[in-house]
């Protein structure tokens, strides 16, 4: 065999061996990834519900003067044009005034608690040593046949921490409250004449 022929045969041997190794590697790689199974969970999301409350005065069976906490900062509003104590500034012994208000869960989640708190009672027109109208008027609050507050003075109500109202309160559910203020007929102390009081009522819905 000539040197030329030897070189030619040797020249084919190496490429053939490299090709064989490449083929084996290819087969091995194909075997490792031959079967796969995959699940993609799409649309995974989360969010927050909304708890808001509206207040209305009920006049002739219809809600009026409606205000909603969604309009206020931090979901809180102050309502002054629905006078829970009736606004009668010329009461005499034996007079009574009832105001009906309605609260509605206007949010997207059920409320787990509903509470009522009374603020300080402030009086004007009182001279030193005179009886305060805060200690003379009587307040009653009823809802759904249940008496929440029974003939208590504004002063006593301020000292009561929290009145719990039946809950839960579902979305779009409403609760009506009758608030009655009475100046007892037995009042004979004329020092309360010409006095006016003011007291905040705070209604809180929680979830």
Question: What name fits each language-model region?
Answer:
Residues 2-207:
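Long, small/polar-residue-biased beta-strand-and-loop interaction regions
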């Amino acid at each position: 065999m000539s040197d030329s022929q030897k070189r030619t045969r040797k020249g084919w041997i190496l490429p053939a061996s490299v090709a064989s190794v490449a083929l084996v590697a290819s087969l091995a790689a194909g075997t490792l990834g031959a079967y796969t199974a995959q699940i993609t969970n799409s649309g995974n999301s989360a969010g927050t519900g909304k708890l808001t409350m509206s207040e209305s005065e009920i006049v002739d069976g219809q809600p009026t003067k409606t205000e909603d906490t969604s309009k206020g900062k931090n979901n809180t509003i102050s309502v002054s044009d629905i006078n829970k104590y009736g606004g009668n500034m010329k009461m005499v012994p034996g007079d009574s005034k009832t105001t009906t208000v309605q609260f509605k869960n206007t949010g997207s989640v059920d409320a787990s608690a509903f509470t009522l708190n009374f603020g300080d009672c402030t009086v004007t027109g009182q001279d030193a040593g005179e009886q305060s109208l805060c200690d003379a008027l009587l307040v009653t609050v009823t809802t759904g046949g249940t008496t929440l507050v029974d003939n208590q003075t504004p002063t006593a109500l301020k000292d009561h921490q929290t009145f719990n109202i039946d809950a839960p309160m579902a979305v779009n559910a409403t609760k009506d409250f009758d608030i009655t203020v009475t100046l007892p007929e037995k009042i004979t102390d004329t020092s309360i004449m010409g006095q006016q009081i003011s007291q905040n009522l705070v209604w809180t819905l929680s979830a």
